[in-house]
Amino acid sequence: MKNTIYMAPMEGLTDFTFRNAYEKIFGKGKIAKYFTPFISPNKSEKFLAREIRDIDREHNNGINTVAQVMTNDAKDFIWTARMLYDEYGYNEINLNAGCPSGTVVSKNKGSGMLNEPKLLDKFLDAVFEDDFIRENIKVSVKTRVGVETDTAFPEIIDIYNKYPLEELIVHPRLRTDFYKNDLNLEAYDYAVKNSRSKVVFNGDIFTRKNFLDIKKKFPQTDTFMLGRGLIADPGLIDVIVSENPEDFSRDLISDKKRMKELHDLVFDARLHIMPGDTHAIHRMKEMWCYMAYVFDDCKKEIKAIKKSQKVADYKSAVDIFFNVAKLTEKDYILFSKKF
């Protein structure tokens, strides 16, 4: 069974600069869908400039991009979907019912939608009652399994089952877990066995071993969404889509070279579009929060990247890093998000 891979939406990380660079250097048709970081509809019924820049088809040429929307207002979802379809050519929209951010959840958005399943049901009912949505838009959902407990997850699955979702992407954690604690694989198993929609696995696939362990537990799952794992180790895609992921032999020297190419493409693009060098460097350091974990022999070089504030200093530190550091394939990675 061939595995299908999606790239997860990650705010500040998987914007169009990263998506395009990744597809050129590593993806090469291996990523079935790239999901945009969420669009948050506002009452003006207009997209922000940065949202337009990210969804613009000229910035997503040659890749299959799915726009993610975060709202708990069906009317806002519908006008956003209509505009995405009419003006930008998107026919698949993903609802964010998974973001654990406190500012999001306090507004009953993201994973906060799971707090009141009846309101989630009301939202989806209104969305699918709309003629335009039914006729033109494929709607998928990215969900968690609950807010503080998973006791309502069967009810949540029952609600999702009432509607013709394109697919259900399950991150098997509670909102209160954020991105820590063990995955709730029992809840994911429940989704696999009870969902009427196609179920996609999302969560903690950072290494080959992570992937093989999940695949062994859920052999019927053939579609996986990866985010942090592809930021940290872009070459992991070659392993997962291979005919035999367990025995696939990687060329880590080549992968390190390609990582440098990816980094440089993203950095150059961000320098071009962002207001000021400092902003672009800060964004790149967010990537290093993950990339640093797959290298050995590089503590001093990583420290120099952290300290750099100017473009010349940053580029010099990065060049030295890639000359010295050794790319390794680890069994487990525990991200601390500190850089």
Spans of features found by a protein language model:
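Flavin-dependent oxidoreductase catalytic cores
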Residues: 1-339
